[in-house]
Amino acid sequence: MRGAVWAARRRAGQQWPRSPGPGPGPPPPPPLLLLLLLLLGGASAQYSSDLCSWKGSGLTREARSKEVEQVYLRCSAGSVEWMYPTGALIVNLRPNTFSPAQNLTVCIKPFRDSSGANIYLEKTGELRLLVRDIRGEPGQVQCFSLEQGGLFVEATPQQDISRRTTGFQYELMSGQRGLDLHVLSAPCRPCSDTEVLLAICTSDFVVRGFIEDVTHVPEQQVSVIYLRVNRLHRQKSRVFQPAPEDSGHWLGHVTTLLQCGVRPGHGEFLFTGHVHFGEAQLGCAPRFSDFQRMYRKAEEMGINPCEINME
């Protein structure tokens, strides 16, 4: 029997996830049992009609007869909404243009009222918990390289699933757009000179200005930083708007993690970052005098990845 399972696994080209390493977190489903169900017809492929978003229910006859559903989405942005979750979903994300997996970054943001399932990053049978099923918690953006794996969504045991819906938005972006995602491994550390110089080239916004105020929002685990900008090098989605007094300045706000402990600071900064799910998120933000030093040094060495007007 064991040999037959492994032979079937090789033919299917897919292994079922194994348990994560030591640490807190709910256990994944029994791997051998669900592997057998998957290989013996317990999984189905669900293709979204618009290839960007998927909405399904665990109460349909087809879903109840299967432990695992495969969902295929081919788009740069969209959403997944799973009502009355039972069993598990494997969500396969791909862009609508050809691009190698190692050059793609995926960001997901759970719906605020999402509940009923845990969301894992899965690759070659290993699971890493991304989003725990905690009802009412604010959805934190999670980003990872597509090369690191795909999404495995596992329903958690519930006595009453009638009020449960698991859902999230997703975005796929090129690896260069994701260069500010060094914050995943060390979310509050300062950027290196190299990371700052690359952020200048790839960020959705690059502005020079001052911190006017900082508001901490514990229930969302974020800090909101209000900026007065005196030089707008680049922006998308109109994050910064002209000041009402027509003073040649722009006003706007960006967010960062509450755990970073951002406070109002004196002096001029260069702010960079990306817009995810309509929200401007802070990336690298060196003091402008420090940026001038590193930029001129790179310019002298001829290693600037791109140019910016320093005046």
UniProtKB/Swiss-Prot annotation:
Signal sequence, start to end: 1-45
Q: Disulphide bridges in this chain?
A: 52-75, 107-143, 188-260, 191-284, 201-306
Q: Give the main localization category.
A: secreted
Quote the subcellular location field of this record.
Answer: Secreted
Q: In which tissues is it expressed?
A: Highly expressed in subcutaneous adipose tissue.
InterPro entries, sorted: Meteorin-like
- Which example biological process does GO assign this protein? brown fat cell differentiation
Transmembrane ranges?
A: none
Q: How is it modified after translation?
A: N-glycosylated.
Task: Select a single GO molecular function from the record's annotations and give it.
Answer: hormone activity
Glycosylation site list: 103
Q: Which domain of life is it from?
A: Eukaryota
Alphabetical UniProt keywords: Disulfide bond, Glycoprotein, Hormone, Secreted, Signal
Tell me which PANTHER family the record gives.
METEORIN-LIKE PROTEIN
Instruction: Tell me which family the UniProt entry assigns to this protein.
Output: Belongs to the meteorin family.
Report the protein's function: Hormone induced following exercise or cold exposure that promotes energy expenditure. Induced either in the skeletal muscle after exercise or in adipose tissue following cold exposure and is present in the circulation. Able to stimulate energy expenditure associated with the browning of the white fat depots and improves glucose tolerance. Does not promote an increase in a thermogenic gene program via direct action on adipocytes, but acts by stimulating several immune cell subtypes to enter the adipose tissue and activate their prothermogenic actions.
Protein name, as recorded? Meteorin-like protein
Lineage, opening ranks: Eukaryota, Metazoa, Chordata, Craniata, Vertebrata
- Provide the gene name from the record: Metrnl
